[in-house]
Amino acid sequence: MFEPMELTNDAVIKVIGVGGGGGNAVEHMVRERIEGVEFFAVNTDAQALRKTAVGQTIQIGSGITKGLGAGANPEVGRNAADEDRDALRAALEGADMVFIAAGMGGGTGTGAAPVVAEVAKDLGILTVAVVTKPFNFEGKKRMAFAEQGITELSKHVDSLITIPNDKLLKVLGRGISLLDAFGAANDVLKGAVQGIAELITRPGLMNVDFADVRTVMSEMGYAMMGSGVASGENRAEEAAEMAISSPLLEDIDLSGARGVLVNITAGFDLGLVEVETVGNTIRAFASGNATVVIGTSLDPDMNDELRVTVVATGIGMDKRPEITLVTNKQVQQPVMDRYQQHGMAPLTQEQKPVAKVVNDNAPQTAKEPDYLDIPAFVRKQAD
């Protein structure tokens, strides 16, 4: 007699916020209802964990810090994480992909994030870190700690996306409030996680499976991400151009990227020609040797808007792989039925359609590990 078997082939994605900055970023993601992922907050500060809206929390280093935080000392943060490696391992086990969100420069995020990444890699998990660098006004010492932390973190992750807060300040304008500035940084962190995770977790006309994502992001080093939102007749071309247009990219040769992951998010009116337009726009800057993966996800709240998220990986790496073609899988089940079957609540999208790109001539050297793109939905706030 045959028994019905429940298929459990969905990739397990976990997002770990480390320290105060990482915890705030993950809390922001929880409020924005990013679906299909599990959230954790890791901190030495017991009070911060008690106040967070993140459902699963891990206090590390209680024997060292007594729950009072790392005192802006990365060494204390690292020792705290080392003390509770077993708890971190238990939280990470079973994941196929882990995002680590952290603010570099402080004690816990800077010191503990590399340990979390090391544990994840030891478990064979695809590990991606999305971190911020401090504002210049936070001081040279904090910036030095951040640089050291990023260097250490890069040794233990598959891909590393770095967001320099000071570049955000230049784009958003000096009149922005401190609260809004940090909020913009959280939005970029959310955008990176959301853009990648939705490719796997949300239904679409062209599906990307976990193996495709692993191909683009595994062992790739420094990465950049960008996002653009537009509406109207030319929304596909405009959103794609905005996603790859950034002042940070002026001195960076993106043709050296070894992998490019593209997520097109729109309502049920998304057209095939629009997907083709986005693909052609992205391939115009990508190397012929790069692995380009394009997928779609559907969000009925987008209405007339279309969002393009691009993650380019392996930037600055000398060795390039042979050309790899990735074929997107057509969904056999009707998209609307599959969407409802998953019981997914639509995301709230508050960005307004934008077609204007703000340029910034701030110099960027090829040696700096700031290979990322500031999404257009952040740049629009400068208008």
Curated annotation (Swiss-Prot):
Question: Which first-to-last residue range defines the signal peptide?
Answer: none
Matching entries from Gene3D superfamilies are given as: Tubulin/FtsZ, C-terminal domain, Tubulin/FtsZ, GTPase domain
One Gene Ontology term of the molecular function aspect? GTP binding
Q: What InterPro entries has UniProt attached to this entry?
A: Cell_div_FtsZ, Cell_div_FtsZ_CS, FtsZ/CetZ, FtsZ_C, Tub_FtsZ_C, Tubulin/FtsZ-like_C, Tubulin/FtsZ_2-layer-sand-dom, Tubulin/FtsZ_GTPase_sf
Q: What is its main location?
A: cytoplasm
Known Pfam families for this protein?
FtsZ_C, Tubulin
- Protein's GO biological process: division septum assembly; FtsZ-dependent cytokinesis; protein polymerization
- Among the entry's GO cellular component annotations, what is one? cytoplasm
Keyword set, alphabetical order? Cell cycle, Cell division, Cytoplasm, GTP-binding, Nucleotide-binding, Septation
What subcellular compartments does it reside in?
Cytoplasm
Q: Which domain of life is it from?
A: Bacteria
Q: Where does GTP bind?
A: 20-24, 107-109, 138, 142, 186
Extract the PANTHER family matched here: CELL DIVISION PROTEIN FTSZ-RELATED, MITOCHONDRIAL DIVISION PROTEIN FSZA
Q: What does this protein do?
A: Essential cell division protein that forms a contractile ring structure (Z ring) at the future cell division site. The regulation of the ring assembly controls the timing and the location of cell division. One of the functions of the FtsZ ring is to recruit other cell division proteins to the septum to produce a new cell wall between the dividing cells. Binds GTP and shows GTPase activity.
Family statement: Belongs to the FtsZ family.
* Subunit architecture: Homodimer. Polymerizes to form a dynamic ring structure in a strictly GTP-dependent manner. Interacts directly with several other division proteins.
Q: Give the protein's recorded name.
A: Cell division protein FtsZ
